[in-house]
Amino acid sequence: MAKHQSVLLHESIKGLAIKADGIYFDGTFGRGGHSREILNHLSDKGRLFAIDKDLDAVQYAKDYFGLDKRFQIFHGSFAQIKEFASQAGVIGAVDGILLDLGVSSPQLDNPERGFSFMLQGPLDMRMDLTQSINAANFVNEAEVNELAHVFRAYGEERFAGRIAKAIVDARKLKPITTTLELAEIVKEANPKWEKHKHPATRVFQAIRIHVNQELTDLSNCLEQCLDVLGPGGRLAVISFHSLEDRIVKQFMRDKEQGNRPPVEVPIKYEELKTNFKKVGKAVKPQSSEIKENVRSRSAVLRIGEKLA
């Protein structure tokens, strides 16, 4: 089992420009790599609030961080960040928010969670095991058109229709209940394999995103972040595929442009009503980090700052 390694750890912490007495949110606790580093930069007066959908992560946080009075974790989605910030009484006073998107290594490496097409396990893929719908429900119950749409929209799978039909044909014989069973069906239906990529990669990603409503949650979270942050507060987001990064990039671009008038209206940049700016360029892992942790290879970090 791979050791959990926080991706772009130093770059994201630097991007948050942590104040010793500041208030911070780690929207994706995982196994606490980023949280631990944030706490290392805080004084006794600093506060860190963490969020995670996964009850295993929440329990880990309580076991390893529970005695730290600066720390508190909420069970739920980062799409509830405004609600949690309100409960904590810190709306509009937060100095930084970190989001490290996607599935965590402990989830991916545990066969029982059903995220991996390389490990035999139940077809589950729920980040939050308290939710009712899992991957098996979707794979065995969705119409062929819905399957194809999800594979195309969330996996950018070229052969979405062909794979969807193969799944529907297979489940007529018996329900599809395991990861390797699904992976084999996808593999056989995929006529052209990408170099250095398992043929089921895109389909598994698509199902995971759909089951966990990952992109919807991301959009909802980003829209709440500016209300949660105080003036000068930083937002740091690490994404792992183009769908996530596109949402983050577009959000930051739109917020930086503010209430932009029609092109024909002459107006200076300084006169635009905006309360957000991008900080620096997108950051990618160094080759040394990729060598040490191959899962970091597609990571992109984007940072922004609330102005007022």
Curated annotation (Swiss-Prot):
Binding locations of S-adenosyl-L-methionine: G32, G33, H34, D52, F78, D100, Q107
GO molecular function: rRNA (cytosine-N4-)-methyltransferase activity
Primary location: cytoplasm
Domain of life: Bacteria
Keyword Cytoplasm included in the entry's annotation: yes
Catalytic reaction list: cytidine(1402) in 16S rRNA + S-adenosyl-L-methionine = N(4)-methylcytidine(1402) in 16S rRNA + S-adenosyl-L-homocysteine + H(+)
Keyword line: Cytoplasm, Methyltransferase, rRNA processing, S-adenosyl-L-methionine, Transferase
Compartments where found: Cytoplasm
A Gene Ontology cellular-component term: cytoplasm
Gene Ontology biological process: rRNA base methylation
Enzyme's top EC category: transferase
Enzyme Commission number(s) from the entry: 2.1.1.199
Disulfide bonds: none
Role played: Specifically methylates the N4 position of cytidine in position 1402 (C1402) of 16S rRNA.
NCBIfam families associated with the record: 16S rRNA (cytosine(1402)-N(4))-methyltransferase RsmH
UniProt similarity note: Belongs to the methyltransferase superfamily. RsmH family.
This protein's name: Ribosomal RNA small subunit methyltransferase H
Natural source organism: Legionella pneumophila subsp. pneumophila (strain Philadelphia 1 / ATCC 33152 / DSM 7513)
Lineage: Bacteria, Pseudomonadati, Pseudomonadota, Gammaproteobacteria, Legionellales
